[in-house]
């Protein structure tokens, strides 16, 4: 359990690859002070149409879908947002102000 007095946010990142396609994301862990802006980079290579996803896994929990790609920028109820940018094959995850409760493992995935 994380202490309420903890001044940093730790985010762990893991790489995922699929056959013939690839995803590269920010290497972790990333440590930020509370209320700092967060950007987790995700770039991909694919020969086919792509569906992009961000998953989050909190301590002792199963991974859950955070965001999926769409034509427009998508924002979830926790304040995370991501927009697919086809010109540079990216789907970066952003949050303007992180909280201690955002400490988790984040996965960028491609289907």
Swiss-Prot record:
GO cellular component: T cell receptor complex
Cited PROSITE patterns: IG_LIKE (PS50835)
Alphabetical keyword list: Adaptive immunity, Cell membrane, Disulfide bond, Glycoprotein, Immunity, Immunoglobulin domain, Membrane, Receptor, Signal, T cell receptor
Subcellular location: Cell membrane
Disulfide bonds: 42-108
Subunit-level organization: Alpha-beta TR is a heterodimer composed of an alpha and beta chain; disulfide-linked. The alpha-beta TR is associated with the transmembrane signaling CD3 coreceptor proteins to form the TR-CD3 (TcR or TCR). The assembly of alpha-beta TR heterodimers with CD3 occurs in the endoplasmic reticulum where a single alpha-beta TR heterodimer associates with one CD3D-CD3E heterodimer, one CD3G-CD3E heterodimer and one CD247 homodimer forming a stable octameric structure. CD3D-CD3E and CD3G-CD3E heterodimers preferentially associate with TR alpha and TR beta chains, respectively.
Name of protein: T cell receptor alpha variable 18
Annotated source species: Homo sapiens
Originating gene: TRAV18
């Amino acid at each position: 359990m994380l202490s309420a007095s903890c001044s940093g946010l730790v985010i762990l990142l893991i790489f995922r690859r699929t056959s013939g396609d690839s995803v590269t994301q920010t290497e972790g862990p990333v440590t930020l002070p509370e209320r700092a802006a967060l950007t987790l980079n995700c770039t991909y290579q694919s020969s086919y149409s792509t569906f992009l996803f961000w998953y989050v896994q909190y301590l002792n929990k199963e991974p859950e879908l955070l965001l999926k790609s769409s034509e427009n920028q998508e924002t979830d109820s926790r304040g995370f947002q991501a927009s697919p940018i086809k010109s540079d094959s990216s789907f970066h995850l952003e949050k303007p102000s992180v909280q201690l409760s955002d400490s988790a493992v984040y996965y960028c995935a491609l289907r």
